[in-house]
Curated annotation (Swiss-Prot):
Coiled coil (UniProt feature): none
Protein name: Putative dehydrogenase RA1029
Lineage: Bacteria, Pseudomonadati, Pseudomonadota, Alphaproteobacteria, Hyphomicrobiales
Molecular function terms from GO: oxidoreductase activity
Top-level enzyme category: oxidoreductase
Length: 330
């Protein structure tokens, strides 16, 4: 047999955001239906001027594919010193029936795509139906990807954006308005942005509370993306006290996600977690039950999202004769 190699530009051509949203919905449902084996992911954090690298491994029983992803970020000196991007991703796909390596693909786009899609899936399930205004705390690549995904499933009338980096905020405003035609209002403070939100999206590498509880108005849906390791934090734990908390994985979010902080401070218990997003999508747990509810989606990211997304890309590549096959096994 031969192994397929897919480069970044090929991956980009092989899947669109609508397909990714479908793949992520499939992933969440599979995870909550005992169709997934997914060990705890591990990360290595380097000293200053370097970043972190995470490894995620997952087996999806329905498609008989095992995926393994390595994804790094925050290596700010990479372009100048090493001639490579500051964020690098690689995904390996194995046929679970033989454990033969069937595909090696660039994974740098997939992490951004499936993470953006996760926010959109939560908006479909948990945001108010009349939600129109988004607040973005953070204006980097993932903040853009969240808008790209949410824009697929609802009409965004305006975005209130805040960043601690003025240059990033300015680029975000220009890029979003040019690509989507959505007005972006530059907020003078985090508080100003949050108070306007029907949907609040946080995508920072924050190490402390960025969003205070009394800024969040009734009916807000919060998409908490940035916290996926101990030490990271974006939300005031008090927000969780009176919110409906939905997570991608109870096991991950209670140990490494935003939900760990209110648990650690005894503001909530594990019993206060409403459920996993897959349970909501399957109809086992209700989604939003009133227009006044504050809902939180805590997303730490799961290997099964990479699995279903990468598998779809692989299928599209085979169907369209894209990529390069090579003889990996003698």
């Amino acid at each position: 047999m031969k192994t397929l190699l897919l480069k970044k530009d090929e991956v980009r051509r092989l899947i669109g955001m609508a397909e990714v949203i479908g793949a992520v919905e499939e992933a969440y449902k599979a995870f909550s239906s005992d169709q997934v084996e997914q060990p705890d992911y591990i990360g290595i954090h380097h000293p200053s001027l370097r970043g972190e690298i995470d490894f995620k491994l997952g087996y999806y029983k329905a498609n008989e594919i095992i995926s393994m992803k390595a994804h790094s970020g925050g290596f700010t000196n990479n372009p100048a010193e090493h001639g490579v991007p500051n964020s690098i991703g690689t995904i390996l796909l194995f046929d679970a029936r033989s454990c033969a390596l069937i595909c090696i693909m660039d994974g740098s786009l997939i992490t951004g795509l499936r993470t953006g899609a996760s926010g959109a899936v939560s908006v479909k399930a948990l945001a108010r139906k009349n939600a129109r205004t988004v607040a973005s705390i953070g204006t980097g690549n993932q903040a853009r990807m969240q808008i790209r995904a949410v824009n697929e499933i609802m009409k965004i009338e305006k975005i209130h954006a805040w960043s601690r980096t003025p240059e990033s905020l300015s680029r975000y405003k220009t890029d979003i308005q040019r690509e989507f035609g959505i007005p972006v209002i530059v907020a003078s403070s985090k508080k100003e942005a949050v108070e306007q939100a029907d949907i609040l999206i946080t995508t920072t590498r924050g190490k402390g509370s960025l969003v205070e509880a009394d800024w969040v108005k009734p009916g807000t849906h919060i998409v908490a993306i940035g916290t996926d390791q101990r030490g990271k934090q974006e939300l005031d734990p008090e927000i969780f006290r009176n919110a409906k908390v939905v997570v991608d994985s109870v096991a991950q979010c209670t140990e490494k996600g935003e939900t760990w902080h209110p648990l650690n401070k005894n503001i909530i218990t594990k019993d206060d977690i409403h459920g996993e997003i897959g349970e909501v999508l399957l109809g086992r747990k209700p989604g939003r039950e009133s227009d006044d509810e504050i809902t939180i989606f805590d997303s730490t990211g799961m290997a099964i999202q990479d699995n279903t997304t990468a598998s779809k890309i692989y299928q599209n590549a085979i169907a369209n004769n894209v990529g390069t096959f090579f003889q990996f096994f003698e």
